[in-house]
C-alpha cells in the first residue's frame, strides 16, 4: 500500500510503549484485541530508502531474503550473511516475488505474471491475467502447499471491490479464487494445509477459509481476527510454527502477532517505521523475522520521526517460522 491506496482515514491516537534494546514485556490494551502482550523492538538490518517495500519471502535454500519495492519497480535479493542487496529493475510495478528454482522466481507485474531470471534479470511471460485491466495492478502473493501462486489485484486509485485473487499454476493455468476485493494482502496456509488466511486491508479483518489440498480450492469463509484501527491497518502476513499470524501494520509502526482461534493480539514487535508492510521468518533456524517498510504516505513530522522508513528490519520474536512454499508443480 502507499498514499495512493489508502482511504481517507482518521486514526485514533496510539501510544507506543517504549522498550529497551532487549525484549521487554509490557501490557498494551486496544478496543478489539485486548490482551497482555510481549513487546519487542526491531533493529535495522539494511538501510535503504524503498518507496514501498513488500513481498517478504525467505529463500531457505539459498539463505536469502527476497522482497520488492512496488513503486520503485525493483526486485531485491538480500543476503544477511554479507549484508549485500542485489537489485533487478522491472518494467512496471512489481507486487510480489516467490522463488521457483535457484535461478528463477515468479513475479507479479502490472500486466501479468512473469518468470524472472535472478542471475540476469530477464523476464518471460507466464500469464496475461488482468492484462486488459489497465486500472489495476497486482499486490501481495504467496504460494499454496501445492506450489500454485495466489496473487491479488487492486485498483490503482484503490476503488473499492475492483480486485480479485487468482491461483496460477507453474504452467500458467489461471483461476479466479476470490473476487470483489479492494487492497489484496497477506496470504498464508497452516502447516497441516487445511486452513488459508487472507487479508483485504480496508476491512481490518483476517479471513479464514477451509483449504482442500487435493483440489487447491477454498470454502467456508469466516472472520478469524478483527483488527482495531487504533493499532493500524493489516498489510502483509506470515505464519509461525504454532500457526499464529504475524501481520505488518500500516500506520501502526509494528508487526503484531494474533491468535486466529481467539482473535487476540498476543505480542507486538515495534518497528522504527510508520508504515510496516510485510514480514517473513528467516535465518538458518527460521527464528528471525525480517520486516519490510515503506517511506511513502507520511507527514513531514512522521518522516522526521522515522528517517529509516523504507529500510529492512529484523527482530527475534521468540518463536520459529515455517518454510514458505516455492512456486512449483511439485507439492
Features from the language model and the residues they span:
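C-terminal motif of bacterial Sec signal peptides marking the signal peptidase cleavage site
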Residues: 15-18
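Bacterial signal peptide processing site
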Residues: 20-22
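A short helix->beta-strand "capping" segment at the edge of beta-propeller domains
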Residues: 30-50, 78-83, 89, 127-128, ...
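Beta-rich, blade/repeat-based domains predominating
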Residues: 48-62, 91-109, 132-148, 177-195, ...
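Conserved beta-strand positions in repeat-built beta-propeller and related beta-rich domains
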Residues: 59-60, 65-70, 106-111, 149-159, ...
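A short loop-to-beta-strand structural motif that recurs across blades of beta-propeller domains
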Residues: 74-76, 112-114, 163-166, 205-207, ...
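Hydrophobic alpha-helical segments and helix pairs
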Residues: 123-179
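Short loop/turn segments immediately following beta-strands, especially the blade-tip
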Residues: 209-217, 316-322
Amino acid at each position: 500500500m502507499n498514499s495512493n491506496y489508502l482511504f481517507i482515514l482518521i486514526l485514533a491516537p496510539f501510544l507506543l510503549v517504549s522498550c529497551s534494546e532487549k525484549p521487554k514485556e509490557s501490557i498494551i490494551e486496544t478496543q478489539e484485541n485486548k490482551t497482555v502482550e510481549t513487546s519487542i523492538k526491531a533493529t535495522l538490518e539494511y538501510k535503504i530508502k524503498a518507496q514501498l517495500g513488500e513481498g517478504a519471502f525467505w529463500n531457505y535454500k539459498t539463505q536469502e531474503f527476497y522482497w520488492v519495492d512496488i513503486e520503485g519497480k525493483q526486485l531485491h535479493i538480500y543476503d544477511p550473511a554479507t549484508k549485500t542487496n542485489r537489485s533487478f529493475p522491472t518494467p512496471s510495478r512489481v507486487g510480489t516475488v516467490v522463488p521457483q528454482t535457484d535461478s528463477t522466481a515468479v513475479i507479479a507485474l502490472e500486466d501479468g505474471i512473469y518468470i524472472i531470471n535472478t542471475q540476469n534479470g530477464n523476464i518471460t511471460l507466464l500469464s496475461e491475467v488482468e492484462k486488459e485491466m489497465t486500472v489495476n495492478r497486482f499486490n501481495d502473493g504467496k504460494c499454496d502447499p501445492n506450489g500454485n501462486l495466489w496473487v491479488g489485484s487492486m485498483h490503482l486509485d484503490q476503488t473499492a471491490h475492483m480486485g480479485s485473487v487468482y491461483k496460477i499454476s507453474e504452467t500458467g493455468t489461471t483461476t479466479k479464487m476470490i473476487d470483489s476485493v479492494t487492497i489484496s494482502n497477506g496470504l498464508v496456509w497452516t502447516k497441516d494445509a487445511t486452513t488459508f488466511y487472507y487479508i483485504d486491508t480496508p476491512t481490518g479483518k483476517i479471513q479464514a477459509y477451509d483449504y482442500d489440498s487435493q483440489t487447491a480450492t477454498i470454502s467456508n469463509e469466516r472472520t478469524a481476527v478483527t483488527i482495531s484501527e487504533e493499532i493500524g491497518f493489516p498489510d502483509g502476513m506470515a505464519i509461525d510454527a504454532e500457526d499464529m499470524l504475524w501481520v505488518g501494520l500500516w500506520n501502526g509502526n509494528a508487526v503484531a502477532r494474533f491468535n486466529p482461534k481467539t482473535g487476540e493480539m498476543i505480542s507486538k514487535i515495534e518497528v522504527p517505521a510508520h508504515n510496516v508492510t510485510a514480514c517473513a521468518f528467516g535465518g538458518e533456524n527460521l527464528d528471525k523475522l525480517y520486516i519490510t517498510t515503506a517511506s511513502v504516505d507520511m507527514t513531514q513530522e512522521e518522516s522526521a520521526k522515522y528517517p529509516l522508513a523504507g529500510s529492512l528490519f529484523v527482530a527475534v520474536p521468540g518463536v520459529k517460522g515455517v518454510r514458505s512454499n516455492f512456486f512449483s508443480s511439485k507439492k
